[in-house]
Amino acid sequence: MLAVAVLAAGKGTRMKSALPKVLQPLAGATLVERVLASARNLAPERRLLIVGHQAERVEAQLSSNGGLEFVLQQPQNGTGHAVQQLLAPLQGFQGELLVLNGDVPLLRAETIEALVSTHRSSQADVTLLTARLDDPTGYGRVFADANGRVSAIIEHRDCSDEQRSNNLTNAGIYCFNWGKLAEVLPQLSTDNDQGELYLTDTVQLLDVAMQMEVSDPDEVNGINNRRQLAQCEGVLQQRLRDHWMDEGVTFVDPASCTLSEDCSFGCDVVIEPQTHLRGACRIGDNCRLGPGSLLDNAELGCDVTVVQSVVRDARVGNDVAIGPFAHIRPATDVGDSCKIGNFVEIKKSVIAAGSKVNHLSYIGDAELGANVNVGAGTITANFDGTNKHLTVIGEGSKTGANSVLVAPVVIGKNVTIGAGSTITKAVPDGSLAIGRAKQLTKEGWDRNTQAAQS
């Protein structure tokens, strides 16, 4: 049996944030959510999150993470003290305990699985993950023989100069025999510079401790400040881009683009510079995104172009051109072969196949039929000051430039709206509707004379 415990009680003072450190976002998910996800494939019998600082906020964020048990550490007095809080909830548990840190979000699932497998095959009391760092400053040093058997872990601040020359470091990730660990946890001492209970001290209290060195030190990067958060974001983004380039996606300037792990792409997608995808974006074959575009939970069909535009929580069909400078807002559904042009905003609307909204328009709370042509400057006036109302435009209809459709209003099929019209009443199929003031022309108008007389 396996239990997984994640240490998530710390304040994260160096982040200088009102948000708990483990809830800081990284590529669309919080740090602690990424840590929990990395152990998902192990299918542990127990999953425990040790909380402390802003415990209620952390628990609220993770309340939908099924089967997660919350254990309070109050006050926070070191990693050993944190794991001591498991003595009661894991009383009688028989198996291994995997201890992860809530601020180490880059650990791969494969590495965790290998650590557990190594621990089980070695039959050690504890197996810890280690990394060789070019600059090990601040990390505890691991001292082990050629067979991987660990004799000691010494925190950086407690190391002598000679001991600090060792660059094999403790990653703070352990797989314990829980029964053996439970026996020695009460023996931990605060006799160190910090006056805290170190989990690392259990290594000297247990009979057999082994280490497994991680192949990529980036995996065990911890996050204590904004710089380290940015560095981890860069590592994770590079992983995501590398994965999708291997799957056939072209990034014209990879370093200028960001993704979330929930994105998916079809074949021959091209992503131009300064384009960002967030949330669960679904991008079909032969799409071209950017430059300078933002997509957030967007679903795009095949052969779609999005140039210098924003698409949020919306669906776009096949063979659609969007932009430049268009804003497709939530709950919008754009059908096949549509054109959404420059400086167009669409909100909570359905645009049926073949329709065009080419210039300078606002379409909100509307239903457009197939092959509608919306003239430049057309506005659906959907808000009466209290409620939003629906505009319906039937298939084949055309609105002239600078038209205002005051909702609620229904425009029938194959209707023509004259330029500059304000439409407040329903227009039947096949009609021409004009609703504008009569033009007044005064010939021989001398503006200077008129100004002097006024």
Curated annotation (Swiss-Prot):
Region (Pyrophosphorylase): 1-226
Binding site for UDP-N-acetyl-alpha-D-glucosamine: 7-10, 21, 73, 78-79, 140, 155, 170, 224, 329, 347, 362, 373
Disulfide linkage: none
Region named N-acetyltransferase: 248-454
Gene Ontology CC: carboxysome; cytoplasm; membrane
Principal EC category: transferase
GO molecular function, one term: glucosamine-1-phosphate N-acetyltransferase activity
Name assigned to this protein: Bifunctional protein GlmU
Organism: Synechococcus sp. (strain CC9311)
